[in-house]
């Protein structure tokens, strides 16, 4: 049986190590030598496992700072709508002020940006006369501005009052 075990160890490439281990275990050691050998091994293991510590950066905080940006846009032409849509794609909130825009251009911009918002699973809220908030999916808009709150401000965009 011993030959079978030795043969198995030699196949596995462990034959020489077992002989060395047996020789080492037979040699008598004093108590101090055992303690020093043990402490030396544990110190070596500790050195191998210790890694230099690096400063820890909180990724959540950095990510939240990026996501909390709000972009205020007041487009003069429809061509600026694409840049506004890019802000939403980059997960930034957009406040769109169309008070100075002509009706046709404002309607086209609202249609384009609301389509982008829908495609990105975002949300849209009217907060004033011709002022809208568009938010990506990572931001929830809470609260509603009722028609009574906006009654003092006359909106030239009748279609925007439907909410």
Curated annotation (Swiss-Prot):
One of its GO terms (cellular component) is cytoplasm. The keyword Cell division applies. Pfam families: SepF. Residues 30-51 have a biased composition (Basic and acidic residues). One of its GO terms (biological process) is division septum assembly. It comes from the Bacteria. The keyword Cell division applies. Keywords: Cell cycle, Cell division, Cytoplasm, Septation. Residues 25-53 are annotated as: Disordered. Gene3D superfamilies: SepF-like protein. Its main location: cytoplasm. It is found in: Cytoplasm. Transmembrane segments: none annotated. Homodimer. Interacts with FtsZ. Cell division protein that is part of the divisome complex and is recruited early to the Z-ring. Probably stimulates Z-ring formation, perhaps through the cross-linking of FtsZ protofilaments. Its function overlaps with FtsA. Belongs to the SepF family. This is Cell division protein SepF. The lineage of its organism: Bacteria, Bacillati, Bacillota, Clostridia, Eubacteriales. The gene is sepF.
């Amino acid at each position: 049986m011993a030959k079978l075990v030795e043969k198995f160890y030699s196949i596995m490439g462990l034959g020489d190590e077992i002989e060395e281990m047996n020789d080492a275990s037979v040699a008598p050691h004093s108590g101090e030598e055992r303690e020093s050998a043990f402490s030396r091994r544990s110190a070596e293991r500790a050195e191998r496992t210790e890694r230099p510590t690096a400063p820890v950066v909180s990724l959540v905080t950095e990510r939240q700072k990026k996501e909390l940006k709000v972009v205020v846009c007041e487009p003069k032409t429809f061509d600026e709508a694409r840049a506004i849509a890019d802000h939403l794609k980059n997960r930034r909130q957009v406040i769109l002020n169309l008070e100075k825009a002509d009706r046709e251009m404002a309607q086209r911009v609202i249609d384009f940006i609301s389509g982008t918002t829908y495609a990105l699973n975002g949300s849209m809220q009217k907060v004033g006369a011709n002022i809208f908030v568009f938010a990506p999916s990572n931001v929830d808009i809470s609260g509603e501005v009722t028609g009574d709150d906006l009654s003092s401000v006359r909106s030239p965009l009748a279609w925007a009052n439907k909410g």
